[in-house]
């Protein structure tokens, strides 16, 4: 889980995460018009097909990033938030550190290849979890199957949205170096699981193996409550404090997945 890998378009989860933060903090609005720069328009790879001199809304850009995996949309939104993609990458790195993604370094908003643009599957899992927890309403974008912009309809590349009704996200990625990648999440009953797969040899393989991993995990692990929120879990003796004993607990209810039958 700690091996350095290229995240490819899985990068765009962080791009969207920062955009959702900006919306929450009222630094952006969904209907805000964004001017498309020549830089964004000329970005290579998967595209939403935005055009210079044709403003696009923040909401359209988010759909272009999440559903269509548009590199052009990612750069346009990065510029709207930070002024330049380079400045936005700095924000991405600062946010990664705050989330505990200590083995991740971003160089761009898209995931286009760069030797210094790397992460780990562990860090990707952290990012996916925080996206779902911190922006539960906005996470619904990842369940959308298609989006039409500029009269061009594109389908979500996450095949699991069609293959399994319990799957409600998240994001695909692909470069020659990264292979075919997929972070997927499914909720069955009260349980949600996230899987991260990188380096598959085809779109079909990444979908098939991700679904196998989800099914295996649901079948072979149970979720148990370790500690309730805001309840004393342990007591610790305090040296020269205002009290001899301090009660320690967790802010949020803590669940853990354990092998079934333990």
Task: Please identify what each model-predicted range represents.
Residues 1-125, 129-134:
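Active-site-adjacent loops and short helices of periplasmic peptidoglycan-processing enzymes
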Residues 102, 113-118, 122-262:
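Domain-terminus/edge residues, biased toward the C-terminal soluble/receptor-binding domains
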């Amino acid at each position: 889980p700690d091996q350095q890998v290229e995240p490819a378009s899985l990068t765009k989860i962080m791009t969207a995460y920062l955009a959702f933060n900006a919306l929450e903090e009222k630094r952006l609005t969904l209907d805000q018009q964004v001017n498309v720069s020549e830089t964004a328009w000329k970005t290579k790879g998967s595209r939403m097909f935005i055009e210079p001199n044709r403003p696009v809304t923040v909401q359209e850009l988010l759909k272009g990033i999440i559903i269509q995996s548009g590199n052009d949309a990612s750069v346009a939104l990065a510029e709207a938030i930070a002024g330049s993609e380079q400045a936005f990458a700095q924000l991405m790195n600062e946010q990664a550190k705050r989330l505990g993604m200590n083995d991740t370094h971003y160089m761009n908003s898209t995931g286009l290849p760069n030797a210094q643009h790397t992460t780990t599957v562990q860090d990707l899992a952290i990012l996916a979890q925080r996206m779902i927890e911190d922006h539960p309403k906005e996470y619904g974008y990842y369940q959308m199957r298609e989006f039409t912009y500029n009269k061009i309809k594109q389908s979500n590349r996450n095949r699991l949205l069609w293959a399994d009704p319990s799957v409600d996200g998240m994001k695909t990625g692909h470069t020659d170096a990264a292979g075919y990648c997929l972070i997927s999440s499914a909720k069955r009953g009260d349980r949600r699981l996230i899987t991260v797969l990188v380096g598959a040899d085809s779109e079909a393989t990444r979908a098939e193996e991700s679904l196998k991993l989800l099914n295996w995990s649901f079948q072979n692990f149970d979720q148990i409550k370790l500690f309730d929120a805001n309840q004393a879990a342990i007591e610790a003796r305090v040296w020269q404090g205002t009290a001899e004993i301090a009660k320690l607990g967790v802010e949020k209810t803590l669940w853990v997945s354990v092998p079934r039958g333990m």
